[in-house]
């Protein structure tokens, strides 16, 4: 944001979240794959650099600091949780060189960057000491109502009346205080010590600054948010589920607007940071999680779960695939019901089929493992066929060992490859073999007992059994 005034953002993130009934800090509970606080920081960081964002932390402060360290934001600790006004008081030294501060809530995760920008622009335009972000939700019960001057026809705020103090006439006003504000730093801290704890909870409420600043002849104004969902906070598990569903559906709508087909989007779980290319089809009950990136022209069938993985263009994922922290190149075919564990790297046009599990395995272009196979710590070349029931034995109880399979190798069904081992290019492995030694290029390896046929044996056996009866 371009402005001549130096502008900071403070995020209230010290609360315990008692109604969540959790041992975890409130702001670290997740929706759409990220902590609540992470969503707020993401919106704020598009307005000011992280060095100008101050998270006020308290309950489980060390855990919150550790979880958000990579964001580059600053932290201010509120050692005693004595209310929102007391929280802002802790930032006095941190904000001494700033002209304005915008106060966000770490448990209000749907706030949008453009709303933050609108709020500050409105605040600056009106030269206000305090600007309140308001909204008109379908059901305003429980929220403090904002009353404007001149019978509601003014930007200036007359007063805020809490739910318990509302008269029946006042209760008809649906404009609520969102708890998100912009302040001029100088009048804020000049008057902050006027806050009292004269309320049922014995806390210092930042909301009371509207009356205090107004009484000091400072200008207090309000601006409405476009969407009431933006300012909804999380207090209960029900709130968490509701906002998660809203954010995920919003994500689906964004993807569909960008050319992605999503059938029954309300059944899909797509995290905030997921990217999907155009003309990809996503069937019901698909989960795309974490930092997943899906290419164009893919088809992802129902009950597939992809997390922190990269999928190339034109990949078909049949029903029930699980892909975790892996890469899949263009035009590969997966499933149904395959499991790619971390560090799997599936090449172009490769096939990983029914009940095949891979881990730390690279599969070359056009290679196929279509049925009932485990491939762990394995390097597979191009044009390889892995028969049904093949197992790489990569673990001796202490250490893991690798298997190398060269280009154009044919591995027969029900084969056991005991690592460390290497199969040379173009070699053949007979079905049912247990291979314990390296196989040269273009060789045939058979590691099984020789078949013995005894003609007439079954007839004699049945005759003997009959005599014993």
UniProtKB/Swiss-Prot annotation:
One of the Pfam families matching this protein, by short name: NTP_transf_3
UniProt-listed SUPFAM superfamilies: Nucleotide-diphospho-sugar transferases, Trimeric LpxA-like enzymes
Residues annotated as binding UDP-N-acetyl-alpha-D-glucosamine: 12-15, 26, 78, 83-84, 105-107, 144, 162, 177, 235, 341, 359, 374, 385
Enzyme Commission identifier(s): 2.7.7.23, 2.3.1.157
Binding site for Mg(2+): 107, 235
Record region (N-acetyltransferase): 259-469
Positions bound to acetyl-CoA: 388, 394-395, 413, 431, 448
Coiled coil: none
Signal peptide: none
Cofactor(s) it depends on: Mg(2+)
Subcellular location: Cytoplasm
Region (Linker): 238-258
Catalytic activity: alpha-D-glucosamine 1-phosphate + acetyl-CoA = N-acetyl-alpha-D-glucosamine 1-phosphate + CoA + H(+); N-acetyl-alpha-D-glucosamine 1-phosphate + UTP + H(+) = UDP-N-acetyl-alpha-D-glucosamine + diphosphate
GO molecular function terms noted in the UniProt entry: glucosamine-1-phosphate N-acetyltransferase activity; magnesium ion binding; UDP-N-acetylglucosamine diphosphorylase activity
GO CC list: cytoplasm; membrane
Keyword Nucleotidyltransferase: yes
Cofactor note: Binds 1 Mg(2+) ion per subunit.
Keywords: Acyltransferase, Cell shape, Cell wall biogenesis/degradation, Cytoplasm, Magnesium, Metal-binding, Multifunctional enzyme, Nucleotidyltransferase, Peptidoglycan synthesis, Repeat, Transferase
Residues forming the catalytic site: 371 (proton acceptor)
Annotated family: In the N-terminal section; belongs to the N-acetylglucosamine-1-phosphate uridyltransferase family. In the C-terminal section; belongs to the transferase hexapeptide repeat family.
Description of how the protein assembles with itself and partners: Homotrimer.
Name of the protein this chain belongs to: Bifunctional protein GlmU
Protein source organism: Koribacter versatilis (strain Ellin345)
Gene assigned in the entry: glmU
């Amino acid at each position: 944001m371009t402005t001549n005034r130096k502008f900071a953002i403070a995020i209230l993130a010290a609360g315990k979240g008692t109604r969540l009934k959790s041992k975890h800090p409130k702001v670290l509970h997740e929706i759409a794959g990220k902590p609540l606080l992470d969503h707020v920081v993401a919106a704020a960081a598009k307005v000011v650099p992280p060095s100008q964002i101050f998270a006020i932390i308290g309950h489980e402060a060390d855990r919150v600091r550790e979880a958000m360290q990579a964001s580059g934001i600053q932290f201010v600790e509120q050692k005693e949780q004595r209310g929102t006004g007391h929280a802002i008081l802790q930032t006095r030294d941190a904000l001494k060189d700033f002209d304005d501060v915008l106060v966000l809530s770490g448990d209000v995760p749907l706030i949008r960057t453009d709303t933050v920008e609108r709020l500050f622009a409105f605040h600056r335009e009106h030269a206000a000491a305090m600007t309140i972000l308001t909204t008109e939700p379908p059901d305003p019960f429980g929220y403090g109502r904002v009353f404007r001057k001149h019978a509601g026809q003014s930007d200036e705020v007359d007063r805020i009346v809490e739910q318990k103090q509302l008269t029946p006439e006042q209760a008809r006003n649906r404009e609520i205080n969102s708890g998100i504000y912009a302040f001029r730093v100088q009048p804020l801290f000049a008057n902050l010590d006027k806050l009292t704890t004269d309320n049922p909870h014995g806390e210092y409420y930042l909301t009371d600054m509207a009356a205090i600043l107004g009484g000091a002849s400072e200008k207090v104004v309000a601006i409405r948010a476009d969407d009431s969902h933006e300012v909804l906070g999380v207090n209960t598990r029900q709130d968490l589920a509701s906002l998660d569903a809203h954010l995920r559906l919003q994500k689906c709508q964004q993807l569909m607007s960008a050319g992605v087909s999503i059938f029954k989007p309300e059944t899909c779980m797509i995290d905030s940071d997921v990217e999907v290319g155009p003309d990809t089809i996503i069937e019901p009950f698909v989960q795309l999680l974490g930092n997943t990136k899906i290419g164009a022209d893919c088809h992802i069938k129902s009950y597939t779960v992809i997390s922190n993985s990269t999928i190339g263009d034109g990949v078909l994922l049949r029903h029930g695939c699980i892909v975790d922290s892996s890469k899949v190149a263009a035009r590969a075919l997966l499933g149904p019901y395959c499991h790619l564990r971390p560090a799997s790297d599936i090449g172009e046009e490769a096939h990983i089929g029914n009940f095949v599990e891979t881990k730390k395995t690279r599969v070359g272009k056009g290679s196929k493992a279509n049925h009932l196979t485990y491939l762990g710590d394995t390097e597979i070349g191009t044009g390889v066929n892995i028969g049904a029931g093949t197992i790489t034995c990569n673990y001796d109880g202490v250490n893991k060992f690798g298997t190398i399979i060269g280009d154009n190798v044919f591995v027969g069904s029900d084969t056991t490859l005991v690592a460390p081992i290497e199969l040379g290019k173009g070699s053949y492995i007979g079905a049912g073999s247990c291979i314990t030694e390296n196989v040269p290029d273009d060789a045939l390896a058979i590691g099984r007992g020789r078949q013995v046929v005894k003609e007439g044996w079954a007839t004699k056996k049945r005759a003997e059994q009959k005599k014993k009866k």
